[in-house]
Amino acid sequence: MDPLTVYKNSVKQQIDSADLLVANLVNENFVLSEKLDTKATEIKQLQKQIDSLNAQVKELKTQTSQQAENSEVIKDLYEYLCNVRVHKSYEDDSGLWFDISQGTHSGGSSDDYSIMDYKLGFVKGQAQVTEVIYAPVLKQRSTEELYSLQSKLPEYLFETLSFPLSSLNQFYNKIAKSLNKKREKKDETE
């Protein structure tokens, strides 16, 4: 073959190769554009989900806040009705526990006001035979407060006790009745 034909064939082959390369690049560009559009659509959908979930979180936070407020209102109501305040509740391996203050407003002088702090525990077990544990909390009481409590409450209420759940109402009534007693005056000789 003559050199011109060889050169012509070589150029034609390069042009065909370049056309094939351009066609491949156009095809790859199209595929990548489709993927990009798909990813953009996915991103929009995910952003909508995120916005929806954020709205749900905000609503749940509002509900939680309202429930906490309602819980405090209920605690306040119980305190006004029964002079009982549940400060904290928690659960451990042994059962469900409550930190409680029970007091009285006898309407008299402020020195006749008494509060008994205690823990009540409901031991895990069968519901019919649930055992209640009572543990007085006296550590942060002044001598005067302890004297006032001792003058009103039976001695056994200064010790840890256990009793069946069915007796809980009697227990509450005993403490309430005792705390409502008028304070016995100290002997002047003490």
From Swiss-Prot:
Cell compartments where the protein resides: Nucleus, Nucleolus; Chromosome, Centromere
Q: What is this protein called?
A: Monopolin complex subunit CSM1
Please provide the record's keywords in A-Z order.
Centromere, Chromosome, Coiled coil, Meiosis, Nucleus
Q: What else is known?
A: Present with 1920 molecules/cell in log phase SD medium.
Entry's Pfam families? Answer: Csm1, Csm1_N
What's a single GO CC term here? Answer: mitotic spindle
Which Gene3D superfamilies does this UniProt record tie to the protein?
1.20.5.340, 3.90.1150.80
Q: Which residues form a coiled coil?
A: 31-70
Q: Which superkingdom, per the lineage?
A: Eukaryota
Q: How does it assemble?
A: Component of the monopolin complex composed of at least CSM1, LRS4 and MAM1. The complex associates with the kinetochore. Interacts with CDC46, CDC47, GIC1, GIC2, MCM3 and NUR1.
Q: Which GO terms describe its biological process?
A: attachment of mitotic spindle microtubules to kinetochore; homologous chromosome segregation; meiotic chromosome segregation; meiotic sister chromatid cohesion, centromeric; meiotic sister chromatid segregation; protein localization to nucleolar rDNA repeats; rDNA chromatin condensation; spindle attachment to meiosis I kinetochore
CDD domains noted in UniProt: RWD_CSM1 (cd23787)
Q: What does this protein do?
A: Component of the monopolin complex which promotes monoorientation during meiosis I, required for chromosome segregation during meiosis. Also plays a mitotic role in DNA replication.
What GO molecular function annotations does the UniProt record carry, in alphabetical order?
A: identical protein binding; microtubule site clamp
